[in-house]
Amino acid sequence: MIGSEIRMAKLFDKGRALVVALDHGLVMGPLKGIENPVEVVAKIAKNGPDALQMTPSMVKLVKENFFSRGSPMLITRLDTANVWRQKYKVYNEGYYASIYTVKDAISAGADAVVTYLVVGYGNDTVEGYNLSVLSSLRKEANDYGIPFIVEPLYVTKDNPDSVKEVDLVKYVTRLASEIGADILKVDYTGNKESFRQVINVAFSPILIRGGPKTNTTEEFLRMLRDALEAGAKGVTVGRNLWQAEEPDKLAKAISKVIHENADIGEALKILK
């Protein structure tokens, strides 16, 4: 467990963490902004993120971005599900699949691993399988001394993302905590008061999910600022960053909010 403590301390060495998620292709295909991983990672890697989140396969394409002492840490995705797939084929009951092992992640250079916990499939057997896989992965992560991140989500077929109703977010957050997550990647519930309730039921630090792209950058930054004030320890952001016109500048702005407690106005100045 000493290894896990060391890696956790590095990720949160500034008290909070900015993680950039680039693993969407495993679920949603080549989304706008990450069609070319080499280009987008080059724009983002040196502009403030504490870690980049991707599959072990993507690491092969962008490995040079992790070579230096000042490089971001690497978080690798181990699994996938189809419950967010809308463009190509809407799912029936939904599936969950384990793709990589913790050993695969470590071989790729990972400093932490991340998995889904999806509640609300049309088939209880799939949900049970998801839980059993997480149990095995948690044990493997503990054996190797690498932080185990869980992304707990409540899904319904009529919602293309995930349900952010506070009681349901609290439920999946506590479920992931009881499984043994070292870090939780959780939906923001819309306001500080309700999100404090989520923070209070968690056993581990919470990073909010960036979620689908917001209408404006200011809207995203305000959500982030509110979440931090409620007790979140950072963010894992994807579409709201790499679908922006200038992701390099926005990465700097987000980092300033997280690490320097900058207000929205200060952060927006970086984008001008």
From Swiss-Prot:
- Catalytic positions are K185
SUPFAM superfamilies reported in the protein's UniProt record = Aldolase (SSF51569)
Q: Does the keyword Lyase apply?
A: yes
- Domain of life, per UniProt, equals Archaea
Name this polypeptide is given:
Uncharacterized aldolase SSO3226
Q: Which GO terms describe its molecular function?
A: acyltransferase activity, transferring groups other than amino-acyl groups; fructose-bisphosphate aldolase activity
Q: Which family does it belong to?
A: Belongs to the DeoC/FbaB aldolase family.
Enzyme kind, highest EC tier: lyase
Which EC numbers does the record give?
A: 4.2.1.-
Q: Which UniProt keywords apply?
A: Lyase, Schiff base
One Pfam family in the UniProt entry: DeoC
